Amino acid sequence: MKIGAQVWRALAKSCLLCATLGCLHFPGSRGGKPDFFETKAVNGSLVKSRPVRSVAEAPAPIDCELSTWSSWTACDPCQKKRYRHTYLLRPSQFYGELCDLSDKEVEDCVTNQPCRSQVRCEGFVCAQTGRCVNRRLLCNGDNDCGDQSDEANCRRIYKNCQREMEQYWAIDRLASGINLFTNTFEGPVLDHRYYAGGCSPHYILDTNFRKPYNVESYTPQTKCEYEFTLTEYESYSDFERLVIEKKTHMFNFTSGFKVDGVMDLGIKVESNEGKNYVTRTKRFAHTQSKFLHARSVLEVAHYKLKSRSLMLHYEFLQRVKSLPLEYSYGEYRDLLRDFGTHFITEAVLGGIYEYTLIMNKDAMEQGDYTLSHVTACAGGSFGIGGMVYKVYVKVGVSAKKCSDIMKEINERNKRSTMVEDLVVLVRGGTSEDITALAYKELPTPELMEAWGDAVKYNPAIIKIKAEPLYELVTATDFAYSSTVKQNLKKALEEFQSEVSSCRCAPCRGNGVPVLKGSRCECICPGGFQGTACEVTYRKDIPIDGKWSCWSDWSACSGGHKTRHRQCNNPAPHKGGSPCSGPASETLNC
């Protein structure tokens, strides 16, 4: 069933009419200053001139389209159910008709086939969760089953732990599955509240922690220096390729969905922080603005998971046990939606503070400044690189000039300066400390110290090493584990294709398309609005190329298979940048 088309389209027409009449409000990134002034060709920089709004017609609505229903599976002998599903062919966009939320169907059935789903348990079978635990864990005061059945009908409780101990910081988040296609944490897949009777204390900062059974190590890091790495980018294209895309990209796995090495955990592009970052920085695409990116990483702990005999969370355990043995994408897709695509095997916990100074090239040249001067002075203001005086001398800039640069940065919201924007991104710590840093002109030692103290007790997961979720399906817990594992791997391949934003139609003005469920949205750069980012004051904006979706893999030939994609979603025009990355991939087979 499709819903809400008339409402969406009426809203689209009213928004377009409102834009035509000039009643839309575009909030600027600087206090009170609109960010949608026309781009004049004065060395390519953004120069404020009399605005003329573009009223380009919004693209036609695109209706959501689902595939036809698959055939019903055979009746599953253990679940006594059969299944069918549909999948997304085309997402809705630009106020097109939405798809019915139901993309699978299940119905009861009868079969004479025997069910052999039980794994033999030599210990105690938990009443509700079905977990198998050692009998020595009964009546020990811990909820080893996850349903308290191991503590029921006890004449006496023999506690292993005689005193209360704390949970490791962020331990529940580390036990969650993670969707690496969207950089989001999902439901719990591991039980980090299970201790197998272990009660060895682990002291960190005078706090006594209890180590979960699944955890191999949780090592505190004692280095507490706030060192900044400052990097200069002479163009937006370099900044986008080396900074933005690394933060917001969707992982593109080629084979096996393995993650090689420890990697930075990016941000969710449709989150508030992701939208703010993309909107404000993309505003300066195809200008001659210069970028100074500063980054400080504070590590507070390193985490490592055991490599075998893991205790799964009972919710995940039951969901996997309820999967049909005959492959049905709809059921396996729901598991991936609810529990993610991967689980974390190693992690770095801590905080990241970073800011980006966006500088007007013409104003810098008029003031006889270089980006190196700004880098030295911004770093010197925080004491980076030793004595501030030595920093000034080393780069050949006077203390007065550095003072003027800092004044330009601090007064950018009050008057026109060579600083076009200061974009801050903070991860880790409490909301109060994050807010204080995010709205400060530049970080002070006092603010950084307060934030660092908060990060110790509220760390974010900033780097991870991960394995595909199907690696948790082992013969220890599941009958027919090899069949379920292969089904889950196949579903992961289909899921990657179905959730990719390459399915979305191009947004105008270099907007970023985001696929949310079965609907695409455009995240617009500053200076653009509308459902497709079609409303703007700017003219003749170069359009950067974006990739289409990958083709299916070819048949295996000569020990190799290939797939291809095209730079046509959209193709670059008006001097826009070409797509980065390969147009084809080849794998051994």
Swiss-Prot record:
Annotated glycan sites: 43, 69, 72, 550, 553
Domain EGF-like as annotated: residue spans: 404-534
Region described as Disordered: 570-589
Residues of the propeptide: 32-53
Keyword Cell wall biogenesis/degradation belongs to the record: no
Modified residues (Phosphothreonine): 417
Keyword Membrane: yes
Protein name: Complement component C8 beta chain
